[in-house]
Amino acid sequence: MNLILLGAPGAGKGTQAEVISEHLHIPTVSTGNIIREALKNGTEMGHKAKEFIDSGRLVPDEVVIGIIRERLAQPDCQNGFILDGFPRTIPQAEALDRMGTAIDRVINIEVADEDITRRVSGRRVCPGCGNTYHLDYKRPQKEGVCDKCGDTLVQRRDDRPETVRERLQVYHEQTEPLKRYYAAAGKLVMVEGQDEVEDTTRLTLEALDGIEPLSPT
């Protein structure tokens, strides 16, 4: 079973990808993770990707697609996979089609922009130990201080409201059209993202109704 997870940045795709991976016993292929792996390993495409990442530009399709192709050819993807973070654009979706990779279902996690902005901008991170907190859902015992190591919590640049709004604008312009693309192919399933992660998980698993899990290996 080959799946794609769609949704705006901050919609909770990564969390739900983990749930689906455990439920169906298939790997999650996260664009961010495999690009970081290519950077770490110093591959040719990893070097190319680094040039764009360092300058704050999107990694071009030919580099991303090459990295995706290599990952999907690995043995653990032969019985299915979950794509998280790819495709991001219609041309990328078309390139995926040209690869001959059949996609069985596309799950879109729908969350309103204002809810995403609230979720993401409320995050706080400890630069010392990496613990994460949230001003609404997971507050530290002492305001602004990490419970674990006592370091001062910070807000990452990517979590600032103005940055979140910019990322959402890019999503609406470049990625949201994929909903129509996959709906036209009869593969799109919409899931309304909820405030509670468990509620979103329940709806996500319902969207997988009829898909039999593989035997764990």
Region locations from a protein language model:
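Glycine-rich phosphate-binding loop of ATP-dependent small-molecule kinases
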Residues: 1-217
